[in-house]
Amino acid sequence: MSFVQIRHISSQINRKTVSIVGSGPSGFYTAYHLLKKSPIPLNVTIWEKLPVPFGLSRYGVAPDHPEVKNCEETFTTCAEEFSSPTNQKHKFSFVGGITIGKEILLKELLDNQDAVILSYGCTGDRKLNIPGELGTKGVFSSREFVNWYNGHPDFAKDKRFTDFDWSKVSKVGIIGNGNVALDITRVLISNQIDEIWENTDISSLALNLLRRAPVKDVKLIARRDFVHSKFTNKELRELWELEKYGIRGRIDPKFFQKEMFDPSKYDRAFNRRVEMCSEYLKPFNERSKKNYKKAPPPSSGYDKFWELDYLKTPLKINRDDFGAINSLSLCNNRLNEDNSLQPLKDVNNIMTYKVDLLITSLGYAGVPMPEFSKLSIGFDKDHIANKQGRVLTSSGEIFPHLYASGWIRKGSQGVIASTMQDAFEVGDRVIQDLVVSGALSLENSIDLSNIKHTTWKDWERINKKELLRGKKEHKTRSKFLTFEELWNGVEGI
Amino acid sequence: IAAHLLRTSPSLLTRTTTTTRFLPFSTSSFLNHGHLKKPKPGEELKITFILKDGSQKTYEVCEGETILDIAQGHNLDMEGACGGSCACSTCHVIVDPDYYDALPEPEDDENDMLDLAYGLTETSRLGCQIKMSKDIDGIRVALPQMTRNVNNNDFS
């Protein structure tokens, strides 16, 4: 199908039109909620810049967490149900391979649609802004690294990864303390344990390179202290549980001892984290509860280590003669009583870590769309200015018919469950507004016949092929790794 | 770039207001997730849900069904984002304290997810991890409000 009629009135149903920009969990959960809850008939279109759907579920979630990707089943059921031209109340279309702001302008959507919802997530990187961060071999942002091993077509065959000498990577530094930092630690420290990775949908190209790295030591470096770590207990527990493979976690006693934390001052999740760490730091046989003694370390003992390292500020990335990273200079920090952070840059407090690979995992940054300033759409630091999901103009007024949901609404924080909740709340407001608003006086449709794009049917073909390739390689899925392969995947069957 | 692609369809120009008509639509299978078995006579177990608006629904179900399956099979507002694999907190329920102790204790993975649940209470559990059994026949569970904490008064 090459023509998407945005305003659909063929079957006597006057549907209000909604366009959603982005097909990750926030975009799809917003669509799902609208289609499930709206009392008035809707025609919902999801626009996606890649030829394939699901955003961070496909390209962000770690390959060894397939259960987290199960939300894709909900999205698929939803898309299948409302894509078919039956006597459905609502209609749904997926349009892939089109960037709003490029092939189609945001202004055109705003002129055409009864509501537009921006759910395009956080597409930039927060930076350290220190010497050596750019242009040094072996220094990557977490977004680049995660996209690479997840087979994102922008990075899967990037020479910065494929030409890098992985056989020299023994010591790794990861800057940051969120779940992404822990995912990356897990990938790197268990890189040679095939039973974890070989059957997943990890990019085979990336896995083969990662396997070459004799990783022995991964340091997770944070500016603040143990209390301020952002990761969740599930991800931390997964790291501790790697001890059955001879992989041991460490925290220096100056940063962590159970007695430092009065349980009455902290919430349940934090107190559980304290117990987990204090138990796992004990030798296996000295632990008090059986759930910390599920699988003993191998008789050969531990030969790989990950470490939570706190109160450091990275100052400079140092290179060898070939332009590759060889060390990281840092200083100690002081955390003042008012929670402000003070880097101590005097000579006594400066140290150097030898590292062969450095990943900066400082969080994803929201980026405004190119038309925002022209259309006077407000943007606050790293997310779209909004009031409960209704987008604000740069002067703080409500921008009519425009909404935001997910990470681009609030910043890059929270798991899929919280994104889902956010999408539902924004969806409710869109419905509230649509029920009382009049329809557009001018009705337009956007002709896509001259713009290359994919439909839901196209994605079904690509999906089928990837699953088939996966079956042959004994993987859950073998993703197409380039745009060319993805577009070719549309053909046939 | 694509301005020339905008096409105004003249036949559509006449319609200026939206009429909100409720047509006889086909029943959507999309809204029916679960497939629940019908309990054999004499073996029915009862469960009561307290919904977000305070109303109550009681169902007769089979042994072994999870609370998530039961809720989805009856189109209640409960998501199972991870498909019931204990990897998210979207099927969070608050169990009537009278029944809470009759449940097997939560495992670490369930507790790790409950850490992230909205409106967590002392008797919170994940719906996907509770299977119906004779021990909990008659159990009452509340679906949490997202905007406020649910407390034990919701059961009185």
From Swiss-Prot, chain A:
<feature type="binding site">
    <location>
        <begin position="223"/>
        <end position="224"/>
    </location>
    <ligand>
        <name>NADP(+)</name>
    </ligand>
</feature>
<comment type="function">
    <text>Adrenodoxin reductase transfers electrons from NADPH to adrenodoxin, which is involved in heme A biosynthesis and in iron-sulfur cluster assembly. Involved in the electron transfer to heme A synthase COX15, a heme protein that catalyzes the conversion of heme O to heme A. Required for the de novo synthesis of Fe-S clusters on iron sulfur cluster assembly protein ISU1. Involved in electron delivery for Fe-S cluster synthesis. Essential for coenzyme Q biosynthesis. May be involved in the electron transfer required for the hydroxylation reaction performed by COQ6.</text>
</comment>
<dbReference type="GO" id="GO:0016491">
    <property type="term" value="F:oxidoreductase activity"/>
</dbReference>
<feature type="binding site">
    <location>
        <position position="100"/>
    </location>
    <ligand>
        <name>FAD</name>
    </ligand>
</feature>
<dbReference type="InterPro" id="IPR036188">
    <property type="entry name" value="FAD/NAD-bd_sf"/>
</dbReference>
<dbReference type="Pfam" id="PF13450">
    <property type="entry name" value="NAD_binding_8"/>
</dbReference>
<dbReference type="GO" id="GO:0005739">
    <property type="term" value="C:mitochondrion"/>
</dbReference>
<dbReference type="GO" id="GO:0005743">
    <property type="term" value="C:mitochondrial inner membrane"/>
</dbReference>
<feature type="binding site">
    <location>
        <position position="26"/>
    </location>
    <ligand>
        <name>FAD</name>
    </ligand>
</feature>
<keyword id="KW-0249">Electron transport</keyword>
<keyword id="KW-0560">Oxidoreductase</keyword>
<dbReference type="GO" id="GO:0004324">
    <property type="term" value="F:ferredoxin-NADP+ reductase activity"/>
</dbReference>
<keyword id="KW-0496">Mitochondrion</keyword>
<feature type="binding site">
    <location>
        <position position="407"/>
    </location>
    <ligand>
        <name>FAD</name>
    </ligand>
</feature>
<feature type="binding site">
    <location>
        <begin position="177"/>
        <end position="180"/>
    </location>
    <ligand>
        <name>NADP(+)</name>
    </ligand>
</feature>
<keyword id="KW-0809">Transit peptide</keyword>
<keyword id="KW-0472">Membrane</keyword>
<comment type="similarity">
    <text>Belongs to the ferredoxin--NADP reductase type 1 family.</text>
</comment>
<dbReference type="InterPro" id="IPR021163">
    <property type="entry name" value="Ferredox_Rdtase_adrenod"/>
</dbReference>
<feature type="binding site">
    <location>
        <position position="48"/>
    </location>
    <ligand>
        <name>FAD</name>
    </ligand>
</feature>
<feature type="binding site">
    <location>
        <position position="56"/>
    </location>
    <ligand>
        <name>FAD</name>
    </ligand>
</feature>
<keyword id="KW-0285">Flavoprotein</keyword>
<keyword id="KW-0521">NADP</keyword>
<feature type="binding site">
    <location>
        <position position="414"/>
    </location>
    <ligand>
        <name>NADP(+)</name>
    </ligand>
</feature>
<dbReference type="GO" id="GO:0006879">
    <property type="term" value="P:intracellular iron ion homeostasis"/>
</dbReference>
<dbReference type="GO" id="GO:0006744">
    <property type="term" value="P:ubiquinone biosynthetic process"/>
</dbReference>
<keyword id="KW-0999">Mitochondrion inner membrane</keyword>
<keyword id="KW-0813">Transport</keyword>
<feature type="binding site">
    <location>
        <position position="235"/>
    </location>
    <ligand>
        <name>NADP(+)</name>
    </ligand>
</feature>
<protein>
    <recommendedName>
        <fullName>Probable NADPH:adrenodoxin oxidoreductase, mitochondrial</fullName>
        <ecNumber>1.18.1.6</ecNumber>
    </recommendedName>
</protein>
<feature type="binding site">
    <location>
        <begin position="414"/>
        <end position="416"/>
    </location>
    <ligand>
        <name>FAD</name>
    </ligand>
</feature>
<dbReference type="InterPro" id="IPR055275">
    <property type="entry name" value="Ferredox_Rdtase"/>
</dbReference>
<keyword id="KW-0274">FAD</keyword>
